[in-house]
Amino acid sequence: MNENGRHQGQHEVLIRKYFLSCSYGSASEIADFFASDATIYDTNHQPISSREQIGQFWIDTREQWNGATWHVDSVIESDQSAAIEWTMKGTLDGDEVIFHGSEHYTIVGGVIREIRQYWSWRRNALTSGLLGYDYPDA
């Protein structure tokens, strides 16, 4: 069960553990969630390919945002796919930053094969997400 009393599917459990690893784990712990030929596609940077590069990418990103943490806000899943909304919290130059985004997963054999990440970042803004949407405190 999740915090809303709803049963979690196997993909949701995997993704929530992956997000905990992105927030607090090592590069190798993060890499363990991915197939060897996995790729992350993103609206803000070039694709990241291979589980090792993905693991190191999240360590670098966490450091860039001074101990950033990621939080799963909602999940919908089916046979080999899942879609989530997420929140990232971190700091930049002493100011809190909060980003919101959406990801689409392909999961095969209990590991992540592909993520397509959608979010926007404007250097002069300390938050991102849907315009006019009242996000709950994640």
Residue locations for each model-derived region?
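Acidic surface patches and DE-rich sequence motifs
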Residues: 35, 42, 92
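Short, low-complexity N-terminal intrinsically disordered segments enriched in polar/charged residues
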Residues: 1-32, 36, 133-138
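A beta-strand edge to alpha-helix "cap/lid" segment located at domain peripheries
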Residues: 2-10, 55, 59-138
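Short, charged low-complexity linear motifs
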Residues: 1-5, 42-44, 51
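A short gly/proline-enriched turn/hairpin at secondary-structure junctions
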Residues: 39-49, 60-64
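Residue-level recognition of short loop/turn positions
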Residues: 37, 44, 109-111
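Hydrophobic beta-strand positions
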Residues: 33, 40, 104-106
